[in-house]
Each structure stands twice: as structure tokens, then as C-alpha cells.
């Protein structure tokens, strides 16, 4: 405003009190400060949030904490490995039975019987393991709506689905269902791709992004991974930044979970090939991911699906998207529904 006033003052010789160079410089200064201030504000807000969360001790997950696991099934070929994973992730002595869901589209009533048969198979497997399980054959206008409503109605803590099996090159890694669920469900989402039976896995490779310890779902997914390692009696190799590795080790001690773990400082997120060389056929890779706009989200996660597809084609895979309540992450729906994947 001052520059514009000065530019509008005409001197006796006909020139402006403040010339065009000053006016252009002021405009450039305003542009630069507006751009820089937005990045500085975001960076400062993140640092303040990290400092506040770092000052508070992370609570341990009680051994008797109620489980509210929901297994969403659709493919009859993956029922057995998905049920086995669900049973192994269930906290011992939990009084809350896991749930199994099959969604029937309103325009496809013929799928009702197929869903009933699949749920019966789930019940038989759970009964053989002496575990009670509740099953639902639910009508809905679409699969995502049916699953998300079930999650909310039953206060689900963990949603388990199978990884999409690509039929065309144009399809995305997670598939339309997985991508839509990431935006619709705020609870912890586990996406599993089985290659070999889970009880034959000899080692877990856990890949964790830096600053994951500051996310609200940190203790929850650590509890699940610890349970899985105990159930199949295998060791865990953890890959992350040094501060996050320290937090992971302390958290397992706090939760009093006996986990045999080796910790590796790892920064080569843009190239997972060195890590893939360590993951043998009898091993399983677990990737802890993050939704866009959260503290632990990094730009390399946009390329993660393509790298995993190229480097881990014949390995058991488990992708974990930690619980991220809207009140903790952001009030903007655009950030909550942003997906760290390449949807084609």
C-alpha cells in the first residue's frame, strides 16, 4: 500500500516518487514471503506437534485389551490365509470375538449364497482353532460403504483385507477397493498378500517410516506385529531411522512382549532392492505405511507400491496403515482421503 501511494505521487518533473522498479520489487517481495511463509508455518506446526508428543510417554497396550478385528472376505481362494492371519493377530484370552464380513451388492443377489458358503468356511476354521467368530452377510449399494459402515457400527479397531490381484496392467497395486477403503476407513487397515502358509514363515522384515512413533496408532500396530512374531515363533528385523528404532525397541519392552528383534538403520527408501535381497522366500515383509498429510508420510510412499511389486513379487507381504482418527490427523477431508498410491 505504501509503495502504491508513493507510485501515485507525481513529482514536478513528471516522474513518480517511487518508480516502477520499486513497485515490481515490492510485488516480488510479497510473492516470495507468501510462498515461503506457508512452508515455514507447516514445518513449525509439525515440529511443535512432535515436541508435544515426545514429551508424553506412549501408553502400553494392555495384554487383555479388547480386540475388534474385522475380516472382509470376497475371494474364496484367500479365505484360509486371511483367517489364519486374523486368528494370529487376535490378542490371547480376548473376550471380544473377531468378525467376518461378506458384502452382497443390491444388484447382485446371486452372490448371497456364495457369501454364505464362504462365511461357513470361516466359521469352521475358527471352530477348529477353538475361537468364536461372528459372521455377517451384509447388503449394500457398494462394497466400500458396506465395510465402512460395519467398521463404525461395531467400533472395529483393525480391518483386514486381502491384496488386490491385478488382472490388467492398468489396474493399481491396491485395486479400487483398497484405495477407496484407505480414504473411507480411519481405523487400522491391514492388507495381506499370502504366498506361503503363515506358519511356515521363518522371519519378519518390518519396514517403518521415520517419525512413525509420533502417530496415534503406533502402539496398536506394534502390538499386532509383536503378537504375530510370537504366534509363529520367528524373529523380526526392523528397518527405520535411528530415533524410530529406539522408540520401537522401548515400546516392545514397555508392552512386555518377548520379541527377538534385530534393528537396522535404513534410509534407502527410493530403492528397496538392497532390502529385497535380505527377504528370502520363507520370509515375510511388513511395510508400515502412512496416509497422506500425516506426520510420518514421506514422498517416497507414492513410489512404494511400484517398488514392492518389482522387488517382492514372490514374498508374503503385509501392509499396515495405522489408525488415524480425523481429530488427530486433520479436519480437512481432502487430506484424510489423499492416498499414497498411484491410482491409474
Which positions does each model-derived feature cover?
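Gly/Ser-rich helix-loop-strand patches that form or flank binding pockets
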Residues: 30-49, 154-197, 277-344
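Short secondary-structure boundary micro-motifs
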Residues: 14, 54-55, 174
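Signature of alpha-helical transmembrane segments and their immediate interfacial
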Residues: 31, 40, 55, 66-68, ...
Amino acid at each position: 500500500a505504501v509503495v502504491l501511494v508513493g507510485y501515485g505521487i507525481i513529482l514536478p518533473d513528471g516522474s513518480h516518487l517511487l518508480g516502477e522498479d520499486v513497485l515490481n520489487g515490492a510485488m516480488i517481495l510479497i510473492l516470495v514471503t507468501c510462498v515461503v511463509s506457508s512452508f515455514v508455518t507447516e514445518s513449525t506446526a509439525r515440529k511443535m506437534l512432535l515436541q508435544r508428543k515426545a514429551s508424553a510417554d506412549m501408553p502400553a497396550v494392555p495384554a487383555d485389551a479388547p480386540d475388534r478385528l474385522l475380516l472382509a472376505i470376497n475371494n474364496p481362494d484367500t479365505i484360509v490365509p486371511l483367517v489364519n492371519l486374523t486368528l494370529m493377530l487376535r490378542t490371547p484370552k480376548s473376550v471380544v470375538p473377531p468378525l467376518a464380513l461378506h458384502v452382497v451388492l443390491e444388484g447382485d443377489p446371486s452372490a448371497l449364497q456364495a457369501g454364505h458358503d464362504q462365511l461357513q468356511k470361516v466359521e469352521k476354521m475358527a471352530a477348529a482353532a477353538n475361537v468364536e467368530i461372528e459372521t455377517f452377510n451384509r447388503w449394500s449399494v457398494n462394497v466400500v460403504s458396506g465395510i465402512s459402515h460395519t467398521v463404525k457400527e461395531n467400533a472395529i479397531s483393525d480391518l483386514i483385507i486381502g491384496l488386490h490381484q491385478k488382472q490388467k496392467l492398468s489396474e493399481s497395486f491396491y485395486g479400487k477397493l483398497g484405495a477407496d477403503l484407505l480414504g473411507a476407513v480411519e481405523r487400522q487397515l491391514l492388507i495381506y498378500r499370502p504366498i506361503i502358509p503363515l506358519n511356515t514363515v521363518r522371519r519378519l522384515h518390518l519396514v517403518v517410516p521415520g517419525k512413525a512413533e509420533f502417530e496415534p496408532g503406533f502402539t496398536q500396530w506394534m502390538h499386532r506385529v509383536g503378537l504375530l512374531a510370537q504366534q509363529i515363533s520367528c524373529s523380526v528385523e526392523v528397518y527405520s531411522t535411528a530415533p524410530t528404532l529406539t522408540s520401537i525397541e522401548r515400546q516392545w519392552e514397555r508392552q512386555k512382549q518377548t520379541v527377538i528383534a534385530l534393528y537396522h538403520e535404513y534410509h534407502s527408501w527410493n530403492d528397496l532392492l538392497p532390502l529385497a535381497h535380505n527377504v528370502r522366500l520363507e520370509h515375510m515383509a511388513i511395510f508400515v505405511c502412512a496416509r497422506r498429510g500425516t506426520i510420518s508420510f514421506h514422498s517416497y510412499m507414492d513410489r512404494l507400491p511400484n517398488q514392492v511389486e518389482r522387488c517382492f513379487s514372490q514374498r508374503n507381504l503385509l501392509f499396515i496403515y495405522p489408525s488415524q482418527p480425523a481429530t488427530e490427523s486433520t479436519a480437512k477431508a481432502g487430506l484424510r482421503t489423499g492416498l499414497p498410491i498411484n491410482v491409474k
